[in-house]
Design a protein with these regions (language model features):
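A non-catalytic, amphipathic alpha-helix used as a structural packing/dimerization or gating element
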Residues: 7, 11, 134, 171, ...
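N-terminal amphipathic/basic leader segments beginning at the initiator methionine
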Residues: 1-19
Length: 330
């Protein structure tokens, strides 16, 4: 019998924390801080149900799902440091709770633990080396997407197009969010992932990230991230790019002047002005429609193929999770 999403989530959480114990209580607290905050664990759930849908064992699927959740947590620690973020999952970012060098080191430790977990799974015969190769792709592509995102902000680059955003976010977020879980599901059962998984998965992952950008402007504290934090961090979101393309010249000049300032120098009143302008400009509605279109195309291509997989009950859970991924409200 296939476990329920809540049962899988509980197992993931238990395994995550279980892999991060240490006799030094301060070190353990640093390692467990982000994993202990919970979260939806969507990526880990996707890996597990994709594995079961393809015929992989529950143990192998749990092992790989735990590794992807470890990836998510160490990447978030580094991302928060690089962006100067204030909050993560409704609480202060790790580098706001501890000195930054300790937070950075904790992220490095989680990265190492991810590879250690995968090597042990390989040595125990749970999966083959192609699973580790896929994790290398995850790290490589995410790092390149982060490079583009940071470079645009640090260089003050604002003359961007929607196509620039789509290329960046395909690497930074979409691959590890939707493509890798589907590919890992096939690899865990020693099958070759179809090209469809990357083609459709990128559309779903991009739709997810666009809605993440929307929620940063329209969300509330339940969302678990600093509201309008993307504006303080100067993120080049699809919404902002569209707004700058369409705004009157005076508004655009004022917005660009604000975005050129470092976070600590951005006046709150000016950030609020830009935030309100984005909400009423039509850029948010346009971005939502783009997300809806991409999600519809991605799901429309994937579901007929997923219906052919051997694990019918797991496939049903997988399809529900993919739908929830792109219909998120928080």
């Amino acid at each position: 019998m296939v476990p329920s999403p809540q049962e899988v989530k509980d197992a993931l959480h238990e395994r995550l924390l279980g892999h991060l114990t240490h006799p030094d209580p301060v070190y353990q607290a640093l390692l467990q801080e982000y994993p202990s905050r919970g979260g939806k664990m969507l990526r880990g759930l996707l890996v597990i149900y994709a594995g079961l849908a393809h015929g992989a064992t529950l143990e192998a699927s749990l092992w790989a799902g735990t590794a992807l959740e470890l990836f998510q947590n160490w990447v978030l620690i580094h991302d928060d440091i690089e962006d100067g973020s204030e909050e993560r999952r409704g609480r202060p970012a790790l580098h706001r709770l501890y000195p930054m060098p300790l937070a950075l080191n904790a992220g490095d430790a989680l990265h190492g633990e991810m590879w250690g977990l995968l090597i042990r799974g390989l040595n125990e015969g749970l999966f083959g080396p192609e699973v580790l190769a896929e994790f290398h792709q995850v790290v490589h592509r995410t790092a390149y997407g982060q490079h583009l995102d940071l470079l645009w902000t640090l260089s003050g680059h604002l003359d961007l197009t929607p196509e620039d955003y789509l290329r960046m976010v395909a690497h930074k977020a979409a691959y590890y969010t939707a493509v890798a879980p589907l590919r890992l599901g096939a690899l865990l059962s020693a099958k070759t992932p179809p090209a469809l998984y990357e083609e459709a998965g990128l559309k779903l992952g991009i739709a997810f990230q666009i809605m993440d950008d929307v929620l940063n402007l329209e969300g509330d504290q339940a969302y678990g991230k600093e509201l309008a934090g993307d504006l303080y961090e100067g993120k080049r979101t699809l919404i902002l790019i569209r707004y700058l393309q369409e705004a009157p010249k005076e508004e655009r000049i004022r917005a660009e002047a604000l975005l050129s300032l470092p976070r600590e120098a951005k006046p709150e009143a000016e950030v609020r002005w830009l935030w309100q302008n984005l909400l009423v400009s039509g850029a948010v509605a346009w971005a939502k429609e783009e997300a809806r279109r991409l999600a519809q195309e991605g799901l429309g291509a994937l579901i007929p193929y997923l219906d052919t997989l051997p694990g019918r009950e797991a496939t049903s859970h997988l399809q529900n999770l993919l739908t929830a991924l792109v219909e998120r409200r928080a």
